Structures are given as C-alpha cells and as structure tokens.
Amino acid sequence: MYRVLSKLSSSIGSSTSRKLVSGRIISSRNYAAKDISFGIGARAAMLQGVSEVAEAVKVTMGPKGRNVIIESSYGGPKITKDGVTVAKSISFQAKAKNIGAELVKQVASATNKVAGDGTTCATVLTQAILIEGCKSVAAGVNVMDLRVGINMAIAAVVSDLKSRAVMISTPEEITQVATISANGEREIGELIARAMEKVGKEGVITVADGNTLDNELEVVEGMKLARGYISPYFITDEKTQKCELENPIILIHEKKISDINSLLKVLEAAVKSSRPLLIVAEDVESDALAMLILNKHHGGLKVCAIKAPGFGDNRKASLDDLAVLTGAEVISEERGLSLEKIRPELLGTAKKVTVTRDDTIILHGGGDKKLIEERCEELRSANEKSTSTFDQEKTQERLSKLSGGVAVFKVGGASESEVGERKDRVTDALNATRAAVEEGIIPGGGVALLYATKALDNLQTENEDQRRGVQIVQNALKAPAFTIAANAGYDGSLVVGKLLEQDDCNFGFDAAKGKYVDMVKAGIIDPVKVIRTALTDAASVSLLLTTTEASVLVKADENTPNHVPDMASMGM
C-alpha cells in the first residue's frame, strides 16, 4: 500500500513541470489568469454593457413601445414587449460589458419578482442614475457622500409616492390597472377583473395556453399549497422553471421518506398506470430523493416531491383536506397504513399539477364532490364555534383553498409566438393588478416620478457632494416620462418641460392619444408597489457600480470561444 501511494505521489509531482524564472517558481498548472482594472476604466466598460441592454429594453416602454425580436438557440424567434425577457436574452463576448449586462438583469429580475411588473421602468432608471453617478465620480465627487445623497433622495421620493397613493377596490379600477400593464389591451384587463371577482383578490389565478384565437377565463376546482419542489431536478420546463404533471397519481404521506424500498410499490404503480407521480410528505431525504431524481432523468418517469404544508396539527388538517380533494388516503401509522403495503386505491388523482419553487397548484382533484362539500361544511361549522382568532383565520384559509377554486386565464392567439407574447403581457398585468390592490395606485405614464422631483427641491443635505446625489435622482426621475413620450414619436424634452410647469399632480401626457389629460380620470395609473420597487432596485444596483473601484475578470482563453450563452436560450 505504501509503495502504491509513493508511486502515485511521485507521479503527481512529476506531472507538474516547474521552471525557475527571475528567482520565482512558475507552475504549469492550468490556473486561470486574471485581468484587473481600476477606477474609471473598470466602471466605463461595465457602464457600456448597462447602457446597451437599457437601450434595447427601453424601446418597449409605454403604450406605443416597440417589439423586440429575440433569436433563440432552439425553435423560432420570440417577439416580445416584456422588459425582463429582453434583458435576460442579452449577453456580450466582452466580459466587463457582460458584467454590466448582468447587473441590469439583476435589477429587472428583482423588480419582476417582488412587484411582477415595472422591469422596463427599473432598467431606464438604472441607466439614468448610473450614467450621472459615474460622471460625477470621474469629476472628483466624493463617492460616499454621493451615495448618501442618492439614498436620501430615494427615501424622500418613496415617502412622496406613498402619501399620494389611492387604494382601489372596484372592478372598474382593477380593470384600468390591468389594462395599462397589458399595454392597453382592455380585454385582458376586463378578464383579470372578472377573475379576481370570482376567486377573490387573494385567490389563485394562473395563466395557460389557450386552444382558440380568443382569450378565455375558466374557474376550476383546485387548491394552492405554499410549498414548492424539494429539488430543482424535478423541473420539466426549464423556461418557466416549473414542474408540470398531467393527470398524475398523488401519494400523501404524513412522515419523512428516506428509505428506497418504501417507495418501490408507489413507483411500480406509477409505471403500470403510465402516469406521473406527485409525492406530498413531511420530507423526502437522501437515498429516496436520489432514487426519484434518477428515475426521472434516466427512467423516464415524471415525478415530483413537495413538503407537506403547515406545521403540527395544522399540517395534519391540511393533508386531510388535500386527501379529500384528490380522493386519496393520508398514509400514516395512526390509520394502520404504510408505504410497504400501499394499494392503488389509496392514491389520489388530479387533472393537472403545477409546481414552482415556492408553491404547488392542484387542479381538478379526483375527490368525491359530495365528500368535498361535507368537508367544507365541517370547516364552516368549526369556524363558527371557534373562539380563537388564530384558529378562525387558519380554518377560513383552509376553507378558501378547498372551495374557492382556481381561475385559469387561457391566452389565445394565431401562432405560438403571438400566444407567448400575449402570455407575457397577461402575466405582467396580473402581477401589477395584485400590487395595486396591495399598496394602491398613483398617476401613470411616469408623471408620479416626474412630480416627485419637486419634493427634492428643498431636501436638506450636509454638503455639495450629497446635493449632487439628490440632483442625480431628480434628473433620473424624468427619464420614464421622457422615454414613454419619445417612443410614441413626440419630443420627450418638451413633454417633460410642460408637465413640470403644472401644479396638478394628476396632469400628464397620454402617449397613446397624444393629449394632455387628467391621468387618473383617463385610467392611466400605476401601482405604487411597482414604481417604488423599480426605483429602489434601480438605485441599489446603480450605487453598487458607482462605488466600484476595481474589477477582477478571468482572462479569456485565446483557444476557446469567449461566448456567454444567453439566459433566454437556456430557458432561464
């Protein structure tokens, strides 16, 4: 054994050639060389990437924004007006530029994740703050004071936006918000308002491909669980990062599953029935999880595992609700049931299950309608008898999930490209509408940010460098209104100048009609949450790059192509 290790050691030592150069030992091991840049040079290259992505994204802004055609490495080209989709599709060969592009993608993705819309606005604001910030730093402004000034201005603007917010509740107001976010398509706005009316403002609304030329709304029996897939290896659609199971069988287990052998009968049942499998358990661990992933990727079995929702007694109750909805039995020792002795009739069914990173939607459960109604009646009765506010809230939540249903927005179109583009708009409109219901609305078209510049006129700062930070934000707040007008074919500077002369904060420019109107009365409104999130995310990322003093990049290998695959072609 010693001789084997010695030979191995000597062979490793000899395989790495070393030579003495100028008194230093240089190893021929393949360590990646680095390019280091400092100061203006480091920021300039990254700023170029930010600007090029922003220019591509900003053409989509407003009611007369233009389409962007994106080439994909597979399938046909994608045509879209969705800012985050455009941003994600862009990458550069130059590494410094690509870092700038990635920063814009971070802004767009973060805004989209929190507010569901406003990605184009966030990108435009990022470019505006960043360009002025980098110029100021290059001119000798103290970057830390500049940062303080920008943060002070952002806080003041957010406060101003919240003070002018108007809460919405009527179907017409909801329709207006959804229509704006759908780039002026009122039909989409009306369908979203109808969906919210049917399932409630907190209800589940999903977006799916339709089978006709027209958009349709369908309310189906379903349940949403606040649990996503245990492992991303269960994903079936890389583009949407979802796992979709059509007509699956469903196993509901009360405890953790870690033993391979305990799952064999369930997997056999799935294979024999040629149906996907959904597993709901406290957890699926180690060998059992590995076997499921192996069967999916090499055995061709569509399978997904999620953790049971809730904790303690609430978890047990939720699993019982799910069992009633799907026609399953909860496998537990208390009921004398075990995985080793499982029978097909103990498994539940559903027409479709969609699992994301954060939640699971089960549509058309295979449970007996009479039993479901009896379960709902039990919950209503328990809710009336309960004296605990907490218990009442939990019971009402369970009742809503069991009886409320799920609204499915089926997007129609003449081609796959058209359906894809319309789905982007419907998703944006749906998210923006939820945001509007949550935090209220303000005048749209960029005018709320434009008038917020007046709130910064008298903002007190400690020195001129901080004042410069405030001025940067003031100038950046004009960019959205300018861009919307310019995309509609009007002089953005003239429009912005005229609006700033007004005292009425609802007065704005309707770019679709080319008129100056009362924006709220005209139905041109934005959710406060969308604009607030876009502004804060843009400032955050802009400050990261403005305060960057050095960049360390891996030097490109001349023998290999320096291509970074775009996120859209990878399905991200």
Swiss-Prot record:
It is found in: Mitochondrion. InterPro entries: Chaperonin_Cpn60_CS, Cpn60/GroEL, Cpn60/GroEL/TCP-1, GroEL-like_apical_dom_sf, GROEL-like_equatorial_sf, TCP-1-like_intermed_sf. Residues 1-31 form a transit peptide. Disulfide bonds: none annotated. One of its GO terms (cellular component) is cytosol. Implicated in mitochondrial protein import and macromolecular assembly. May facilitate the correct folding of imported proteins. May also prevent misfolding and promote the refolding and proper assembly of unfolded polypeptides generated under stress conditions in the mitochondrial matrix. This is Chaperonin CPN60-like 2, mitochondrial.
